[in-house]
Amino acid sequence: MRIGHYQLRNRLIAAPMAGITDRPFRTLCYEMGAGLTVSEMMSSNPQVWESDKSRLRMVHVDEPGIRTVQIAGSVPKEMAAAARINVESGAQIIDINMGCPAKKVNRKLAGSALLQYPDQVKSILTAVVKAVDVPVTLKIRTGWEPEHRNCVEIAQLAEECGIQALTIHGRTRACLFNGDAEYDSIRAVKQKVSIPVIANGDITDPLKARAVLDYTGADALMIGRAAQGRPWIFREIQHYLDTGELLPPLPLAEVKRLLCAHVRELHGFYGQAKGYRIARKHVSWYLQEHAPDDQFRRTFNAIEDSSEQLEALEAYFENFA
């Protein structure tokens, strides 16, 4: 699949997730088979651009793959400026967030709240597309609420504004992450626009990935929560799409290798004072299958030293040897 002049190596994209898709996680997902990874959502508010959090969220020129940054906001001029700043910092694709359902984002008329105001959507998309010379993409939900699904209208508007690809999460804002994602709306959008359409929502395994591609006709898939603690899902899905065969479960020794390497990267990226705190949630996701009683996770989350975290993980996996 192509986005503008960029050719993706496959049709699997790691979704932007606030507090999760930092550089270590993006790099790991790319190594595990994602064709594209997207940064955490960055605010277009210029007052926060120079914060340590924003600097960490920006892409880095030595990252693997096509560097993609997602921005969010409601003011066209600020969104355009944010896009320019990120391109100057190394972004090769700019993604606009109009899908986030979080209240703190929607209260500022950003994220999925914008789906209620097509005229404002048009103003933002036009401003960002004109501001940069790299491809601009858009991520939305199917609408604001089930009774008002307007994703087809927004998709057609996006294409008219010069958006190069569109990701649709198969829920409305009102649905949050409750219930099941629906794919009829994504299928309807695909039939109405010529730009690439990326399906998102509840794509949890290779069989589901194949089914969603076949049903919607989507050009690609975006995978988010299913990759938490399981970044190898991209490799599993791609293998199934290529061969029709399922890979065997990842050996525990490989899970250990990936987890410990990920934790070390988090320690290095965030520093000793913060890295161990960030690592806790990732370790919890990795071990959901192996530590269902939560005892180890509770013990691990009480550790406040990076080296002790790694020692605890080594000891934990030795019990399975």
UniProtKB/Swiss-Prot annotation:
It holds the Pfam family Dus. GO terms for molecular function: flavin adenine dinucleotide binding; FMN binding; tRNA binding; tRNA dihydrouridine synthase activity. It catalyses: a 5,6-dihydrouridine in tRNA + NAD(+) = a uridine in tRNA + NADH + H(+); a 5,6-dihydrouridine in tRNA + NADP(+) = a uridine in tRNA + NADPH + H(+). Signal peptide: none annotated. Keywords: Flavoprotein, FMN, NADP, Oxidoreductase, RNA-binding, tRNA processing, tRNA-binding. Its cofactor is FMN. Coiled coil: none annotated. FMN binds at residues 16-18, 70, 139, 200-202, 224-225. InterPro entries: Aldolase_TIM (IPR013785), DUS-like_FMN-bd (IPR035587), DUS_fam (IPR001269), DusB (IPR032887), DusB-like (IPR004652), tRNA-dHydroUridine_Synthase_C (IPR024036), tRNA_hU_synthase_CS (IPR018517). The active site is at residue 100. PROSITE patterns: UPF0034 (PS01136). Its EC number is 1.3.1.-. Transmembrane segments: none annotated. Belongs to the Dus family. DusB subfamily. NCBIfam families: nifR3_yhdG. HAMAP family: DusB_subfam. This is tRNA-dihydrouridine synthase B.
